[in-house]
Structure formats: structure tokens, C-alpha cells
């Protein structure tokens, strides 16, 4: 689960991480009143959406007068803000953050993420703040430092000093940086976050360290422990198809391609998408029906996939362990009839009741392409899309 920047900064304040004074606004009038309350003389008008790159997209403006606050608020509220993370359609801006300007001497990058490979938390930091970390990793990988934190030990003073010196924090500011790093780690740990990203973390002219931005992701499996964080949820920022899928215990993530994927198991779903890309196709979604799929769940999965008008073919890839292939086959046949499927459908099933499942598909009279291997399935679904172009 993601939250807005202003909500992230509310959390940071609770954990004694310094952030600029700021007030959220939901209208132009509220933006002006917020600026008046803050006092100025410089304000930052910031679009609030669940995506990065807002500044490059025109969603962050520096205002030096009340007239500019009003003008920028009018321009940004309601706009379809397009960034590298929103996709070409962009996201509508319904909220603003009006914030005091900052005396920026130096910008740093700081983030904490969960590293499942090492079973540790990893802090990534860089002297190149304010930039996309992907760009820094590509052009100046030597400027990114990583510190792995054992969750049984926590972040130590020695860790903090390695980070601060590694990104070039002045000696006089290292004690404060140490406190900020520790409080950021405590925020991450105590809220069950899977990501905390501060870009930029700044050094002010007075030598103080401050978080100028705040991006959070939270482990959805831990949200039952944090009703105060669940209250931050903004459904308007979430994909409608993903919300609909969650009602049926389906795990769905929209992608940019044109081949719908219905798979059981996250690992098999990832492998299926890799196979599609290997043979020149582009997956339109990640969709895991889990181990307890019914005809109803499969039908709803088809409905959700086909709401994406870019879908030109569907690949169903099932491994029947706990899941029975005949149950999936019944669901596929039912779904095809309910949604009146008009795009090519490729089905590959292996495992429990595999032959019975294939017979159900063959006897349905529907133009379903049945395959035995993942390679064959991916090849045929990509070919079906190419043929229909």
C-alpha cells in the first residue's frame, strides 16, 4: 500500500524526522489559506499522487508570491499529471501539499528496502539526490552506497557514520545525520514498511538535515497491525481493476502490453511473462488466481483482464498441484461464454486431472488453442496477436 507525500511526512514527524512545515489542500482556496498560515515568503506547491517524477511532469512549482500560489494551485489541481511512473495516461491530481521553501545547500538520496535475498534491510544512499536513483545507478554506480542492516541488531552508529561519510555529509552535521538515519530506520521498522525513500534528503545552509520528500510502501500483510496507516489509503489513486480483483482474492497488476495472463502461483506467473517477452510479446497484466480457483473466480478474472482494451489475446497457464486442471477448464469454458470472448485464447495445463481438463476444452466447441509446453504456449499467443494486427 502506498500513501501520499504529506501523509508520509506526518508519519516522519511522529518519529522525530525533520521535515518542512506543510499543509495539504484540496482546493485553490485551501491552498491560498495554507500559504497564508505558513507565512512564506517562499512556498512550494506540490501535486500529491502515488508516483514519482512529479517535478519533471510540472507537478511541483516554487511560488514567491500569493498570486503565484493561487496560479500554480489552479494549474496543478485537476491536471492529468504524466510521469515515468504513471504511464502515458497520467494520474489526476486531487490534492496538493503547500510547503515552506527550503534553504538547500546539498541534496542526498536515502532509502530503506527489504532485501529478501540476504534476509536483511538494505539502506541505499547517494550524494546524487534529487535525481532518479535508476539514472544514478546507470551513469554513476560508484556514487551509491549500500549498508545491510541485520534486523536482529538494528541500525548502529557505525552504520550511520559509514552512510554519512560515504555521501559526503559535512563533519559538523554527522551527529544530526546519525539521528535522522536512526529515526528513519525506526519509522520503517515500526510501521512495517517495505520501502521508505527520501529523495531528496537535504543539508540546509544552517547545517541541519531535513527530509524534503517522503515515499512509503507498506507490507499489505501487516496492515492489520496498523489501522492508522490503513486510514491513509486513497482508493482514487489505485488501479480500479486491482481493487476489483482483490474482492475475489485475485492478485492483479496492470501492465502496458497486449497479452492477458491468467496463472496460478506468483512464480509461474513471472515465468510466463518472461516467456511471452522472450518470444516478442508484451504481457498486459500479472494475474495470480491462487490455489483455490473456482469457475466464478476464473470468470471474474477474464472480466477484469478484458476491461483493458489493449488486450488482444489471453494466455492461461496452469500447474495442477492442489489445483485441479478440470476445475480450471470448466472455469475457462464458463468464462468464455459469459464474457463472449472474441480474442484468441491459448491454454496450457499440466498436473492433476490434466487429460480431463484438456477433454473439457476440446469438447466445448470453443476455438481454444491447447498446448503442452510453456514455450509452445508463449509462441502461439504471440503469433495470435501478430496475426490479428
Swiss-Prot record:
Residues given in the record as Mg(2+) binding sites: 199, 213
Keywords per UniProt: ATP-binding, Ligase, Magnesium, Metal-binding, Nucleotide-binding, Tricarboxylic acid cycle
EC numbers: 6.2.1.5
Residues involved in substrate binding: 264, 321-323
Domain ATP-grasp, chain residue ranges per copy: 9-244
Cofactor binding note: Binds 1 Mg(2+) ion per subunit.
Pathway linked to the protein: Carbohydrate metabolism; tricarboxylic acid cycle; succinate from succinyl-CoA (ligase route): step 1/1
GO molecular function, one term: ATP binding
Cofactor: Mg(2+)
Residue runs in coiled coils: none
Catalytic activity: succinate + ATP + CoA = succinyl-CoA + ADP + phosphate; GTP + succinate + CoA = succinyl-CoA + GDP + phosphate
Pfam entry (one): Ligase_CoA
PROSITE patterns (UniProt xref): ATP_GRASP, SUCCINYL_COA_LIG_3
One example of a Gene Ontology biological process annotation: succinyl-CoA metabolic process
Keyword Hydrolase assigned: no
Binding site for ATP: 46, 53-55, 99, 102, 107
Gene Ontology cellular-component terms listed: cytosol; succinate-CoA ligase complex
Family: Belongs to the succinate/malate CoA ligase beta subunit family.
Function: Succinyl-CoA synthetase functions in the citric acid cycle (TCA), coupling the hydrolysis of succinyl-CoA to the synthesis of either ATP or GTP and thus represents the only step of substrate-level phosphorylation in the TCA. The beta subunit provides nucleotide specificity of the enzyme and binds the substrate succinate, while the binding sites for coenzyme A and phosphate are found in the alpha subunit.
NCBIfam families in UniProt: PRK00696.1, sucCoAbeta
Subunit structure: Heterotetramer of two alpha and two beta subunits.
Name of the featured protein: Succinate--CoA ligase [ADP-forming] subunit beta
Organism for this UniProt entry: Polynucleobacter necessarius subsp. necessarius (strain STIR1)
Top-level taxonomy: Bacteria, Pseudomonadati, Pseudomonadota, Betaproteobacteria, Burkholderiales
Gene (UniProt): sucC
Amino acid at each position: 500500500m502506498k500513501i501520499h507525500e504529506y501523509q508520509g511526512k506526518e508519519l516522519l514527524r511522529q518519529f522525530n524526522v525533520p521535515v518542512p512545515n506543510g499543509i495539504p489542500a484540496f482546493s485553490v482556496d485551501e491552498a491560498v489559506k495554507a500559504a497564508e498560515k505558513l507565512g512564506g515568503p517562499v512556498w512550494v506547491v506540490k501535486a500529491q499522487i502515488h508516483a514519482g517524477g512529479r517535478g519533471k511532469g510540472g507537478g511541483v512549482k516554487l511560488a514567491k508570491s500569493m498570486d503565484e500560489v493561487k496560479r500554480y494551485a489552479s494549474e496543478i489541481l485537476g491536471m492529468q499529471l504524466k510521469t515515468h511512473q504513471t504511464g502515458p495516461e497520467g494520474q489526476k491530481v486531487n490534492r496538493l501539499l503547500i510547503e515552506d521553501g527550503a534553504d538547500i545547500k546539498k541534496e542526498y538520496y536515502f532509502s530503506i528496502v527489504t532485501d529478501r535475498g540476504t534476509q536483511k534491510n538494505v539502506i541505499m544512499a547517494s550524494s546524487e539526490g534529487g535525481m532518479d536513483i535508476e539514472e544514478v545507478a546507470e551513469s554513476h554506480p560508484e556514487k551509491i552506497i549500500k549498508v545491510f542492516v541485520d534486523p536482529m541488531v538494528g541500525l548502529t552508529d557505525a552504520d550511520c557514520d559509514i552512510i554519512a561519510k560515504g555521501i559526503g555529509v559535512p563533519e559538523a552535521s554527522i551527529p544530526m545525520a546519525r539521528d535522522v538515519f536512526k529515526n528513519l530506520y525506526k519509522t520503517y521498522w515500526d510501521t512495517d514498511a517495505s520501502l521508505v525513500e527520501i529523495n531528496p534528503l537535504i543539508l540546509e545552509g544552517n547545517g541541519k538535515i531535513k527530509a524534503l520528500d517522503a515515499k512509503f510502501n507498506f507490507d499489505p500483510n501487516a496492515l492489520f497491525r496498523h489501522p492508522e496507516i490503513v486510514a491513509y489509503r486513497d482508493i482514487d489513486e489505485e488501479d480500479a481493476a486491482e481493487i476489483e480483483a482483490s474482492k475475489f482474492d485475485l492478485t492483479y497488476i496492470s501492465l502496458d502490453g497486449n497479452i492477458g495472463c491468467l496463472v496460478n502461483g506468483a512464480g509461474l506467473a513471472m515465468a510466463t511473462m518472461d516467456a511471452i517477452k522472450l518470444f516478442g510479446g508484451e504481457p498486459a497484466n500479472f494475474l495470480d488466481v491462487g490455489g483455490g480457483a473456482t469457475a466464478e473466480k476464473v470468470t471474474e478474472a477474464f472480466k477484469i483482464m478484458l476491461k483493458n482494451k489493449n488486450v488482444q489475446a489471453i494466455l492461461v497457464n496452469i500447474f495442477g498441484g492442489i489445483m485441479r486442471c478440470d476445475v480450471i477448464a470448466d472455469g475457462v469454458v464458463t468464462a468464455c461464454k459469459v464474457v463472449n470472448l472474441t480474442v484468441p485464447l491459448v491454454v496450457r495445463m499440466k498436473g492433476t486431472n490434466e487429460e480431463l481438463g484438456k477433454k473439457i476444452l476440446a469438447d466445448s466447441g470453443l476455438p481454444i488453442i491447447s498446448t503442452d509446453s510453456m514455450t509452445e504456449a508463449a509462441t502461439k499467443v504471440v503469433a495470435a496477436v501478430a496475426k490479428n494486427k
